[in-house]
A protein has these predicted regions:
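Conserved N-terminal helical subregion
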Residues: 2-4, 74-183, 191-196, 252
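N-terminal Rossmann-like FAD-binding beta1-loop-alpha1 element of flavoenzymes
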Residues: 6-33
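Conserved Rossmann-like nucleotide-cofactor binding loop
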Residues: 16, 39, 177
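Glycine-rich FAD pyrophosphate-binding loop
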Residues: 25-50
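N-terminal FAD cofactor-binding segment of flavoenzymes
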Residues: 46-88
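Conserved FAD/dinucleotide-binding core of flavoprotein oxidoreductases
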Residues: 97-100, 217-292
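Central beta-strand plus flanking loop segment that forms part of the substrate or channel wall
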Residues: 177-213, 220-222, 250-252, 268-272
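FAD-binding beta-loop-beta segment adjacent to the flavin cofactor pocket
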Residues: 288-302
C-alpha cells in the first residue's frame, strides 16, 4: 500500500475512528489512522473507566470484522433492563419498567441478549489487534495533523512529523472539540447540562444476573450496568461487579468527589440500594462534565 496516496485518512483513533478505519481496510480501501497519542495509552486500565453497551446489530458488525473473538470473554450479556423513577424526595417508586430479552427474539427466532457491556479498554485493545493485522490500514501514532489542504478531488494532510499524506477522503473522528471541524469552518451549537457523570466500578455480594438497571433520581440518572465477574490477575477473582454511571448536579458532584471513602461509600450505597446485598466502590473514580455539541453540518470538501 502506498501510504502517502490513500483512499481514506481517519483522524482520531478512539472507538469510532478505529472502527471506521478497520471497516474501510477490510473493504479493501487503503486507509491511514492517525492520532496524537500513543495507541497503547488507550488500553491502559487508568485511561478510561467507562464501559460501552454494544447492541445486537453492533455485535454482528464486530463479528463480521473479526473483532468479537477478542471481546467475547470480556462481554457481559444484558438479559433484562429495569427502569425506575424517584420523586423529588429521592424515594424510589415501587413500580418499574421491565424489558426481558426473551421477548426480543433475534433473526433466527431464538432469544438473544439485548446487548453486551464491555469495558472500553478491552474494546480498544480488540480493535487495535485487528487493525494491526489489516494490511490495508497503516497506524500513524503518535503524530498530529498540523495543516490540511482540500480540493474537490483530494485532501492533503501535513503531519507534525514532517510527513505528508494525500487521501481521496478524510474523516475526522477527533471528538466534539475536534480541530479539523473548526479548520473546515463548520460551526456548532454547544451547551452544558450543568451535570457531571461520576463513573466507577462497584462490587456487590449477589450476582446481577445480567440485569441492567437505571434509576431516575432528582439529581440525574443512576445506571447500574452488568459487568463480567472480576479476574484473578486483577485481584478481583470471582467478585460480582457492575459499572456505575452516576449523574448529579455539577455542584453536588464536585462535593461528592471530594468526600473521604467512608462518606462517599455511604452516599453511593444509599443510591444503589440493597437489591444485590452489601455494595462498595472499587478502584478509581472518573468524572465527565455532561454537555452537547451539535455540528451545523457533517460534510465538507473532501
Amino acid at each position: 500500500m502506498d501510504s502517502d496516496r490513500l483512499d481514506l485518512a481517519v483522524v482520531g483513533a478512539g472507538l469510532n475512528g478505529s472502527l471506521l478505519a478497520l471497516a474501510a481496510g477490510e473493504a479493501g480501501l487503503s486507509t491511514a489512522l492517525i492520532d496524537r497519542m500513543p495507541l497503547k495509552s488507550f488500553t491502559d486500565a487508568g485511561f478510561d473507566g467507562r464501559t460501552t453497551a454494544i447492541a445486537y446489530t453492533s455485535q454482528r458488525l464486530f463479528a463480521a470484522l473479526g473483532v468479537w473473538p477478542d471481546l467475547a470473554d470480556q462481554a457481559e450479556p444484558i438479559l433484562d433492563i429495569r427502569i425506575s423513577d424517584a420523586g423529588h424526595d429521592g424515594r424510589p417508586s415501587p413500580l418499574f419498567l421491565h424489558f426481558d430479552h426473551r421477548e426480543a427474539a433475534a433473526e433466527d427466532g431464538e432469544p438473544a441478549p439485548m446487548g453486551w457491556i464491555v469495558e472500553n479498554r478491552f474494546l480498544r485493545a480488540a480493535l487495535q489487534h485487528r487493525l494491526a493485522a489489516c494490511k490495508q490500514v497503516e497506524l500513524i501514532a503518535p503524530d498530529e495533523v498540523i495543516e490540511t489542504r482540500r480540493d474537490p478531488d483530494r485532501a492533503e494532510l501535513f503531519l507534525k512529523s514532517g510527513r505528508r499524506l494525500a487521501a481521496r477522503l478524510v474523516a475526522s473522528a477527533e471528538g466534539r472539540l475536534g480541530a479539523m471541524r473548526e479548520e473546515a469552518g463548520i460551526g456548532a451549537r454547544a451547551w452544558s447540562y450543568d451535570q457531571i457523570a461520576i463513573v466507577l466500578v462497584a462490587r456487590h455480594e449477589r450476582p446481577h444476573r445480567g440485569v441492567a438497571q437505571e434509576k431516575f433520581l432528582p439529581g440525574g440518572p443512576f445506571a447500574m450496568l452488568p459487568m463480567r465477574d472480576g479476574a484473578p490477575h486483577e485481584g478481583l477473582a470471582g467478585e460480582h461487579r457492575s459499572s456505575i454511571v452516576w449523574t448529579e448536579r455539577a455542584d453536588l458532584a464536585r462535593r461528592l468527589l471530594e468526600l473521604e471513602p467512608p462518606r462517599f461509600q455511604a452516599e453511593f450505597a444509599r443510591r444503589f440500594g440493597d437489591h444485590l446485598g452489601p455494595v462498595e466502590p472499587v478502584g478509581p473514580r472518573w468524572w465527565f462534565p455532561l454537555g452537547l455539541v451539535h455540528a451545523e453540518r457533517y460534510i465538507d470538501t473532501r
